[in-house]
Amino acid sequence: MQIFVKTLTGKTITLEVESSDTIDNVKSKIQDKEGIPPDQQRLIFAGKQLEDGRTLSDYNIQKESTLHLVLRLRGGGKKRKKKTYTTPKKIKHKHKKVELAVLKYYKVEDDGSVKRLRRECPNCGASTFMANHKDRLYCGRCHLTLKLEA
């Protein structure tokens, strides 16, 4: 039977084969016609690469079927060297959580009442304390400044 082999250049070769021929035999016939060594040849039929030990009938290759010839690529990408850094890595800052930090904003009086040690901002509302400076109180969020009477 006759099959066609289409090369990378677009040239079509006709080969006379039998359905019992192996893929190795087909590759050697291509070598006789084109001069490409069989170890560099890859034959593709119906989107599948043909393995050397199997026959044409295994892949259901019939008369006047077209095989595509592509060349095997040698090697792969170049291996990259791992970078070595001369300076040691910077140690990340670890957040230290103080368990009872809230207690420094309040004071419990002798009679049991709770007094705020820092003043809250009247604009921003609760939980935004104002910074104590020697002559003023300052809110870092809304930039409100209150002068203290001496």
Swiss-Prot record:
There is a cross-link at residue 76 (Glycyl lysine isopeptide (Gly-Lys) (interchain with K-? in acceptor proteins)). A zinc finger (C4-type) spans 121-142. Gene3D superfamilies: 6.20.50.150, Phosphatidylinositol 3-kinase Catalytic Subunit, Chain A, domain 1 (3.10.20.90). InterPro entries: Ribosomal_eS31, Ribosomal_eS31_euk-type_sf, Ribosomal_zn-bd, Ubiquitin-like_dom, Ubiquitin-like_domsf, Ubiquitin_CS, Ubiquitin_dom, Ubiquitin_ubiquitin-like. Residues 1-76 form the Ubiquitin-like domain. GO terms for biological process: cytoplasmic translation; modification-dependent protein catabolic process; protein ubiquitination; ribosome biogenesis. SUPFAM superfamilies: Ubiquitin-like (SSF54236), Zn-binding ribosomal proteins (SSF57829). It comes from the Eukaryota. It holds the Pfam family Ribosomal_S27. SMART domains: Ribosomal_S27 (SM01402), UBQ (SM00213). Keywords: Cytoplasm, Isopeptide bond, Metal-binding, Nucleus, Ribonucleoprotein, Ribosomal protein, Ubl conjugation, Zinc, Zinc-finger. One of its GO terms (molecular function) is zinc ion binding. There is a cross-link at residues 6, 11, 27, 29, 33, 48, 63 (Glycyl lysine isopeptide (Lys-Gly) (interchain with G-Cter in ubiquitin)). One of its GO terms (cellular component) is nucleus. In the N-terminal section; belongs to the ubiquitin family. In the C-terminal section; belongs to the eukaryotic ribosomal protein eS31 family. Ubiquitin is encoded by 5 different genes. Ubi1 and ubi2 are synthesized as a polyprotein with one copy of ubiquitin fused to ribosomal proteins eL40A and eL40B, respectively. Ubi3 and ubi5 are polyproteins with one copy of ubiquitin fused to ribosomal proteins eS31A and eS31B, respectively. Ubi4 is a polyprotein containing 5 exact head to tail repeats of ubiquitin. There are 2 genes for eS31 in S.pombe. This is Ubiquitin-ribosomal protein eS31B fusion protein.
